[in-house]
């Protein structure tokens, strides 16, 4: 008999029903469960697949460069970044008819095009690219890197080049190489690029491979470095009247500490960023030499962790046993990596708009909105994934004997206290926040807005004042002109920073009031509830009072039959599934808040947000309804406009989202009956019955149907908001 899919599981391959296909897809990446898997093959497969992942990433970024060079308007955008709309790529087949062709022909293009809202134009411009030839060169280089990654992946699957398990478990060497190599050397290389290429380009000097060795990045060359006069590199920075990309008002400094933003581009000073990356490189190059490898010097991770025993013995055996637990569990390592990456991605979202690094991106409002929303959603998915793999660790990899009385065991032992405290916090936040919103709503409805309960966020305002914001009248730390910190920084970074923080046109430390206080607590409710579900799912993954033997049932099980009535919906997978809905809703509130606050800031009517955000009807009417009106008019009886594609996506997003409920609110029996009826009809219909299949059609399992429902809910939800966000912002600001 020919080998059937899935080859990695003979048990599944012999399944006579369509379950074979769906379970095969579902477990394709669960290498641990495959036939004939060994620890060595598991590590080698994952390692090789990383190269494939890198190849895809480089191919994708190469494609971005290539399409902009081929079909974009980069060179004309560079001449006037504030008024030319950047083109992502052409549209081959604009729907529908001549009005569509006219609506989508913009940005100086000859035919219909898509506008870029990704910020790549600003990024490439900032790092020194200026011509289409530069873009083509970059695309070709990344294509080469992609091919090398693929070859490396293939190579590391060959017997001679397969690394051993001991190589994968050499934590110190990996840490040293990742700290020094990945972060240290790459930051140093980036500093080099900024100093040798990007900063000269910002001053009108075109440095490429042909003149790279002839152009001094600084008039003094390397002299100050070797004589210890490093301050010379900071002297004569670009002036406030500097025109980016020209020598007008340009200085000669390469490593500065100016603070604040370049007045014309509204982005951080390039010389400040070069300085920052040099400092990061220095720190990480040192950090990458701290762990003991072949040379017998430096820290041993195991010794470090074993020494971490809290004094007085009140917290048990501290970190004893953690080294082997983490080093032998891929799920634990993945959980840690995802948790870190998720937090970093969310921080990227927060910093990209408040401290823009790329020239002119702050004035491209749609791009700012798109990048913030994109990074927050990505962060949400990554963070929920961290808890999912944490739960799988507890089920598959956790060894109670190895972790006796250490921090991990103690987390499990007092999980009731953790879960109940989180539950209390969520209930408190939810009822109080909703109570305030509903009260204010009723007061507005009855025409007595003065009876609203409006709470000033005085603690947050105090923190903003401590960082130098003067408008609240707190005379504290950096907002106090006679403090030591203020005086110490007056000649260095502070003037730029204080100008930026008190300038009302940027997004640095926005002025906050009662509307912000309320939505902040609504978001806190969402964060705490999402965390509650995820933490409970992981801590109860091995077992609970209700189901002490839960770990024997694995990560995702629907129920343990009718005999134990209460065991449905309590697998660790179910917790993840529920948490994703909460995560999506929470990030919905986060992005609504960010977007509305910024729309009013950009339009110069901040009072609309301040007055309408304190009650629910204000959010529904003055944010959602008001901003979707243009979107809903993408198609109308008079034809179409450039927003029509977003109008279509808005409708389509709702359709996908609603389809999710079809899977979420009906279970196996219904579908099984339906499938059997359809199969019966198919077999008795002429022509149709010429098509036969080997597998008996059966309904999806409960867990799989939930996954399909969740996928549709998530994709539809994000599609809908993406269309709303881009259309409402670009419709207002072009």
UniProtKB/Swiss-Prot annotation:
The similarity comment for this entry is: Belongs to the PsaA/PsaB family.
Keyword annotations for this protein, in alphabetical order, are: 4Fe-4S, Chlorophyll, Chloroplast, Chromophore, Electron transport, Iron, Iron-sulfur, Magnesium, Membrane, Metal-binding, Oxidoreductase, Photosynthesis, Photosystem I, Plastid, Thylakoid, Transmembrane, Transmembrane helix, Transport
**One of the record's GO cellular component terms:** photosystem I
**Sections of the chain in a coiled coil:** none
Per UniProt, where does chlorophyll a B1 bind?
A: 654
The subcellular location is:
Plastid, Chloroplast thylakoid membrane
Q: Where does [4Fe-4S] cluster bind?
A: 559, 568
- Residues reported to bind chlorophyll a B3: 662, 670
Highest lineage ranks of the organism?
Eukaryota, Viridiplantae, Streptophyta, Embryophyta, Tracheophyta
Alphabetized Pfam families for the sequence: PsaA_PsaB
Q: How is this protein situated with respect to the membrane?
A: Multi-pass membrane protein
Q: Name the EC number(s).
A: 1.97.1.12
One annotated GO biological process: photosynthesis
- Superkingdom in the source lineage: Eukaryota
- In which organism is this protein found? Lactuca sativa
Cofactor comment text: P700 is a chlorophyll a/chlorophyll a' dimer, A0 is one or more chlorophyll a, A1 is one or both phylloquinones and FX is a shared 4Fe-4S iron-sulfur center.
In UniProt terms, what function does this protein have?
A: PsaA and PsaB bind P700, the primary electron donor of photosystem I (PSI), as well as the electron acceptors A0, A1 and FX. PSI is a plastocyanin-ferredoxin oxidoreductase, converting photonic excitation into a charge separation, which transfers an electron from the donor P700 chlorophyll pair to the spectroscopically characterized acceptors A0, A1, FX, FA and FB in turn. Oxidized P700 is reduced on the lumenal side of the thylakoid membrane by plastocyanin.
| SUPFAM superfamilies, per database record | Photosystem I subunits PsaA/PsaB (SSF81558)
Task: Provide the binding site for phylloquinone.
Answer: 671
Show the stretches that span the lipid bilayer.
Answer: 46-69, 135-158, 175-199, 273-291, 330-353, 369-395, 417-439, 517-535, 575-596, 643-665, 707-727
Which one of the record's GO molecular function terms can you name? oxidoreductase activity
Q: How does it assemble?
A: The PsaA/B heterodimer binds the P700 chlorophyll special pair and subsequent electron acceptors. PSI consists of a core antenna complex that captures photons, and an electron transfer chain that converts photonic excitation into a charge separation. The eukaryotic PSI reaction center is composed of at least 11 subunits.
Reaction(s) catalyzed by this protein?
Answer: reduced [plastocyanin] + hnu + oxidized [2Fe-2S]-[ferredoxin] = oxidized [plastocyanin] + reduced [2Fe-2S]-[ferredoxin]
What enzyme category does the UniProt record give?
oxidoreductase
This chain belongs to which protein, by name?
Answer: Photosystem I P700 chlorophyll a apoprotein A2
Against PROSITE patterns, the record matches this protein to: PHOTOSYSTEM_I_PSAAB
């Amino acid at each position: 008999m020919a080998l059937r899919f899935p080859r990695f599981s003979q048990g599944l391959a012999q399944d006579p029903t369509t379950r074979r296909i769906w379970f095969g897809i579902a477990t394709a990446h669960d290498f641990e469960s495959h036939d004939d898997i060994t620890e060595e093959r598991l590590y080698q497969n994952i390692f090789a697949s990383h190269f494939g992942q890198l190849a895809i990433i480089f191919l994708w970024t190469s494609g971005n460069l290539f399409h902009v060079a081929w079909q974009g308007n980069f060179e004309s955008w560079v001449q006037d970044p504030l008024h030319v709309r950047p083109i992502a790529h052409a549209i081959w087949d604009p729907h529908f008819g001549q009005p569509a062709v006219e609506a989508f022909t913009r940005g100086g293009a000859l035919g219909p095009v898509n506008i870029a809202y990704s910020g790549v134009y600003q990024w490439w411009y900032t790092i020194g690219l200026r011509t289409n030839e530069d873009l083509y060169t970059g695309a070709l280089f990344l294509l080469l890197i992609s091919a090398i990654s693929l070859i490396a992946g293939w190579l590391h699957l060959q017997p001679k080049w397969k690394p051993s398990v001991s190589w994968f478990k050499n934590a110190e060497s990996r840490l040293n190489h990742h700290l020094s190599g990945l972060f240290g050397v790459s930051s140093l290389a980036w500093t080099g690029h900024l100093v040798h290429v990007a900063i000269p380009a910002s001053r009108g000097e075109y440095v490429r491979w042909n003149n790279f060795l002839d152009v001094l990045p600084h008039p003094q060359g390397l002299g100050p470095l070797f004589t210890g006069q490093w301050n010379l590199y900071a002297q004569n920075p670009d002036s406030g009247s500097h025109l980016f990309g020209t020598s007008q008002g340009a200085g000669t400094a390469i490593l500065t500490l100016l603070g604040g933003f370049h007045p014309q581009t509204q982005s951080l000073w390039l010389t400040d960023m070069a300085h920052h990356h040099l400092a990061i490189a220095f720190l990480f190059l040192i950090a990458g030499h701290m762990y003991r490898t072949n040379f017998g010097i430096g820290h041993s991770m195991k010794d470090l962790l074993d020494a971490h025993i809290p004094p007085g013995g009140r917290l048990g055996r501290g970190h004893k046993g953690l080294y082997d637990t983490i080093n032998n569990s891929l799920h634990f390592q993945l959980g840690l990596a995802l948790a870190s990456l998720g937090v970093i991605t969310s921080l990227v979202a927060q910093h990209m708009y408040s401290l823009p690094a790329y020239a002119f991106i702050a004035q491209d409002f749609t791009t700012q909105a798109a990048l913030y929303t994109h990074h927050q959603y990505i962060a949400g998915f990554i963070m929920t994934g961290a808890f999912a793999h944490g739960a799988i660790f507890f089920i598959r990899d956790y060894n109670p004997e190895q972790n006796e009385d250490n921090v991990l065991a103690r987390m499990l032992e007092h999980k009731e206290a953790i879960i109940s405290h989180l539950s209390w916090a969520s209930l408190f936040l939810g009822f109080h926040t909703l109570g305030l919103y509903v009260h204010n709503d009723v007061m507005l409805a009855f025409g007595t807005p003065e009876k609203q309960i409006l709470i000033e966020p005085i603690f947050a305002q105090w923190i903003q004042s401590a960082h130098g914001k003067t408008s609240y009248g707190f005379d504290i730390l950096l907002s106090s002109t006679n403090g030591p910190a203020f005086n110490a920084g007056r000649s260095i970074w502070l003037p730029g920073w204080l100008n930026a923080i008190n300038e009302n046109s940027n997004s640095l430390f926005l002025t906050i009031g009662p509307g912000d206080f309320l939505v902040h607590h609504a978001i806190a409710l969402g964060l705490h509830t999402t965390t509650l579900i995820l933490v409970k799912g992981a801590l109860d993954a091995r077992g609970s009072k209700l189901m002490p033997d839960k770990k024997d049932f694995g990560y995702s099980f629907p129920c343990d039959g009718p005999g134990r009535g209460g065991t449905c919906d309590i697998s660790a997978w179910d917790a993840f599934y529920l948490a994703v809905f909460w995560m999506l809703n929470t990030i919905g509130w986060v992005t609504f808040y960010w977007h509305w606050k910024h729309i009013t800031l950009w339009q110069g009517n901040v009072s609309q947000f301040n007055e309408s955000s304190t009650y629910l009807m204000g959010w529904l009417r003055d944010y959602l309804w008001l901003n979707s009106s243009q979107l809903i008019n993408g198609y109308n009886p008079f034809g179409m406009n450039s927003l029509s594609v977003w109008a279509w996506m808005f409708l389509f997003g709702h359709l996908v989202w609603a389809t999710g409920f079809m899977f979420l609110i009906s279970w196996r029996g219904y579908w099984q009956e339906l499938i059997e009826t359809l199969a019966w009809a198919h077999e008795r219909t002429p022509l149709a019955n010429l098509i036969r299949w080997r597998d008996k059609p059966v309904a999806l399992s409960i867990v799989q149907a939930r996954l399909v429902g969740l996928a549709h809910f998530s994709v539809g939800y994000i599609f809908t908001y993406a269309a709303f966000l881009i259309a409402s912002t670009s419709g207002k600001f072009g």
